[in-house]
Amino acid sequence: MAQVTNTYSTYDAVGEREDLSDIIYSISPTDTPFMSGIAKENATAVFHEWQTDALAAAASDNYQIEGDEISFAAPSATTRLGNRTQISRKSVIVSGTLDSVSKAGRNNELAYQISKASKELKRDMETSLTANQAPVTGDDSTPRRLAGLESWIKTNTSKGGGSGADPTTSGTNARTDGTQRAFTEAQLKDVIKQCWDEGGDPSMIMLGSFNKQVLSGFTGGSTRFDPAENKRLVAAVDVYESDFGAMTVVPNRFSRSRSAYVLQPDMWGVAFLRDFQLM
């Protein structure tokens, strides 16, 4: 096989136009199921606080005689909790010349970089919110740090052996990891029961990809069907039927892969002191 003498080919020519697609492809995930699934509210100080309360235990011996002289019980005070506001940022700088030249895939370089940084910031926030991290008060040389999801869960847990320990007080210190073990349905059912017994009504199970696949094999999810019109059994378990109601199963790429969370989303929220801003 040989080329005819003096054939002028693409390898010799000058001035061929580039074939550069006008689309920029990215498969980097931007879903933030925890932050997107909980309440949003405003903070007015760097330490955002709220109160919790509980009812007295139900009693079966609450029966009195007629005309009894009342003995007043001392009221119980509310519990005051709080979390630090954390400053997160992404910075971009673009030259005026770059913004002026012709580019593939975007017209305005600064706008493109801001959009990209905003998505990265959102991922960082999801990672911080679901982290096992204790709060930091901060000072002029130390940044404030929020208490992550795992530092708030001090009861209703199932953890591995060894030195594993729950946080001593909600939102004040991180949990101590125990020895890692296989995720089982018995563990999941135990935690759901603990939550329900304590008055909770959990509706979400959040976990990483590995444990999501493990959960797909649990008995509680084996009756999960697609829409009623076709009754087709699907492989992915999006709803887990527990003894205390159906629970949405939500995979999260940014929470700790070693942990699975049983949550009641309406009892969680994120407060913004300064929402997303361009400066």
What are these regions (language model features)?
Residues M1-M279:
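Flexible, glycine/threonine- and acidic-rich loop/arm segments that mediate assembly and lattice contacts
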